[in-house]
A protein has these predicted regions:
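N-terminal regions of ATP-driven nucleic-acid and macromolecular assemblies
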Residues: 1-132
Length: 132
């Protein structure tokens, strides 16, 4: 219900490969196409540096074909992350009270920005706002 405000179900495509290498291939092809603004892969382990580099190159190619912003690739990995070669590393954890649902969003690593944390809270109209 919360995500309906942001994600139209008719505009999503799910691929469910069995192997991580196939998930990364799907992600690479989607990024390279330039027609998909965001690609998310949920992995059980950290990818090696070579596949991450391939994703970077695919996103650069996709940016040439995109009429809007360059495509964004998001790798969901266990724990606090640890994939080599990523541009940024984030951590999202629940941080709710009975009165207000929320999350703690932390930028753990970024090449051009220091670590930082935000408290993200849900507003009555199901939007989210950074509280800190």
């Amino acid at each position: 219900r919360i995500l309906r405000a942001f994600l139209d179900p008719a505009r999503r495509l799910f691929a469910t490969p069995q192997r991580a290498v196939d998930s990364l291939w799907c992600m690479e092809e989607a990024l390279r196409s330039g027609v998909v603004p965001v690609v998310v892969a949920d992995l059980n382990d950290y990818p090696a540096l070579t596949p991450v580099r391939r994703l970077h190159l695919a996103a650069e190619t996709g940016a040439k074909y995109s009429a809007k912003a360059p495509p964004l690739g998001v790798l969901l990995t266990p724990d606090k992350g640890g994939a080599a070669g990523v541009e940024t590393r984030w951590l999202l954890q629940p941080d709710s009270t009975e009165e207000q649902p929320g999350w703690q969003l932390k930028r753990l690593k970024a090449r051009r920005a220091p670590p930082r944390a935000w408290h993200i809270a849900q507003t009555p109209d199901y939007c989210f706002t950074a509280m800190t």
